[in-house]
């Protein structure tokens, strides 16, 4: 599954809107929107914040990380 779909499904499973999710991760609503629309992908700093959020809430991080890494490989960003 593309990262954009993974991150959107994750946010929805947390019952958050884009603004709330962005606030939880320390990014803007616009940033979350761009991730979900496939126009941008999180930088490493945002992925670390996402991992911390998952750990604090007892949520699985691995599917998000896997999708993010696969997306980076496909784009040649490794």
Predicted regions and their residues:
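Short Asp/Glu-rich motifs
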Residues: 30, 41, 73
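Short, charged recognition helix plus adjacent turn
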Residues: 44, 61-78
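Residue-level detection of the helix-turn-helix DNA-binding "recognition helix"
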Residues: 12, 26, 37-39, 55
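Residue-level recognition of specific faces of alpha-helices
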Residues: 6, 31-34, 46
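DNA major-groove recognition helix of helix-turn-helix/homeodomain DNA-binding modules
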Residues: 43-63
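Short alpha-helical DNA-recognition segment
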Residues: 15-34
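Short basic helix-loop element that most often maps to the first helix and adjoining turn
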Residues: 5-20, 49
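A detector for short, charged/polar N-terminal pre-domain segments
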Residues: 1-2
